[in-house]
């Protein structure tokens, strides 16, 4: 597999192969509080080269998005920056279910794009509130 620091990593495993191997730790009821999603594509699962970080379907395979804090890997990695602007990556990550977006290539561009997406209805305020509530919940729970 490629290194997502320099290119998009791709797995050609099927959903069943992933569920029976790589995803086994996520299937166990371990009380997982947070998970970092990497920039890996699984075209045999979702039919495209969309990185897991930007795919609601792939994120759903590894987490209970309602209770698990979903964190992106760095959005400044080449796996993202070669194909997406900072704004596109930020919007798609939020739409996919990510709660914390790490290190976009340009924070002002990512912020402005998300703000515009909320203002034009592409992202609902309720969606951002959901992430905000999860972050606050875990900050309280762990006294951070």
Locations of the language-model features?
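Second-shell residues forming the walls of enzyme active-site clefts
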Residues: 1-116, 122-126
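Mid-to-C-terminal alpha-helical segments outside catalytic/metal-binding sites
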Residues: 119-144
């Amino acid at each position: 597999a490629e290194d997502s620091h320099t290119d998009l990593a791709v797995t050609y495993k099927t959903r069943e192969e992933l569920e029976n191997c790589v995803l086994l730790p996520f299937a166990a009821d371990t009380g997982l509080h947070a998970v970092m999603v990497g920039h890996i594509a699984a075209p045999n699962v979702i039919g495209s080269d969309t990185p897991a970080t930007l795919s609601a379907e792939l994120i759903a395979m590894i987490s209970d998005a309602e209770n698990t804090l979903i964190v992106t890997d760095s959005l400044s990695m080449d796996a993202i920056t070669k194909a997406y602007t900072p704004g596109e990556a930020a919007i798609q990550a939020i739409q996919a279910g990510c709660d914390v977006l790490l290190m976009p290539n340009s924070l002002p561009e990512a912020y402005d794009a998300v703000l515009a997406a909320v203002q034009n209805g592409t992202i609902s305020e309720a969606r951002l509130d959901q992430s905000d509530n999860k972050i606050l919940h875990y900050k309280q729970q762990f006294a951070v």
